[in-house]
């Protein structure tokens, strides 16, 4: 039996989500059509709103609907002198849930990966350099993932900070090597923050 082109299109587009293969996408599509059409319409509206209205914070580059995000706008955080560098916006959420950090952030949107053509400019290190030059930070905390690429990125940023005589530390590796911040439990992340060490 030939299925509907619209259904095939829905299944194909659901596959763009991480971890969703052909079978999972098909189950999702059939569930929405058979049991939850109003939920499907709400999902479509939420996706449309998010895709059209959410951009990047002009200071830290996380996701926001405003020019600057709530964290960057917070006066107490502006005077903390602490900057935490993370790879992805989801990493901010993971760190915020621990309640261990009261400074500001900078999101790289990735990590250095020369083999994939991702150099310093592609992850916004020129913008980070400007922030370090224009704002007063007494410590930069590197919270990149404990991977080869994350380590290389952290070392590159550490050099940038040391050239400006800014204290630089890296969160401790209570996080499993090869893991990603957004999947780590709060206790492990708390220990990692409390056990961070200075580089250089």
Curated annotation (Swiss-Prot):
Gene3D superfamilies per record: 3.40.1360.10, 6.10.250.240, RecR Domain 1
Recorded GO MF terms: DNA binding; zinc ion binding
SMART domains in UniProt: TOPRIM (SM00493)
Family stated for the protein in its record: Belongs to the RecR family.
GO BP annotation list: DNA recombination; DNA repair
Protein name in the entry: Recombination protein RecR
Name of the gene encoding the protein in the UniProt record: recR
HAMAP family: RecR (MF_00017)
Domain Toprim residues, every copy: 81-176
Segments forming C4-type zinc fingers: 57-72
Function: May play a role in DNA repair. It seems to be involved in an RecBC-independent recombinational process of DNA repair. It may act with RecF and RecO.
SUPFAM superfamilies membership: Recombination protein RecR (SSF111304)
Superkingdom field: Bacteria
InterPro entries with a match to the protein in the record: DNA_Rcmb_RecR, Rcmb_RecR, Rcmb_RecR_Znf, TOPRIM_dom, TOPRIM_RecR
UniProt keyword terms in alphabetical order: DNA damage, DNA recombination, DNA repair, Metal-binding, Zinc, Zinc-finger
């Amino acid at each position: 039996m030939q299925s509907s082109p619209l259904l095939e299109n829905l299944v194909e587009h659901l596959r763009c989500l991480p971890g969703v293969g052909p079978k999972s996408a098909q189950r999702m599509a059939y569930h929405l059509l058979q049991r939850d059409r109003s939920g499907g319409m709400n999902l479509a509206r939420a996706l449309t709103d998010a895709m059209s209205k959410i951009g990047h914070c002009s200071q830290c580059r996380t996701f926001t609907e405003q020019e600057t995000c709530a964290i960057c706008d917070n006066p107490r955080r502006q005077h903390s002198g602490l900057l935490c560098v993370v790879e992805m916006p989801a990493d901010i959420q993971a760190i915020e849930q621990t309640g261990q950090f009261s400074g500001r952030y900078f999101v790289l949107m990735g990590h250095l990966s020369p083999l994939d053509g991702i150099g310093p400019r592609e992850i916004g290190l020129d913008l980070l350099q400007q922030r370090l030059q224009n704002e007063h930070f007494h410590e930069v905390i590197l919270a990149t993932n404990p991977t080869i690429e994350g380590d290389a990125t952290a070392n590159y940023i550490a050099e940038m900070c040391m050239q400006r005589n800014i204290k630089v530390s890296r969160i401790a590796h209570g996080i499993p090597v090869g893991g990603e911040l957004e999947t780590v439990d709060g206790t492990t992340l708390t220990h990692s923050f409390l056990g961070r060490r200075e580089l250089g």
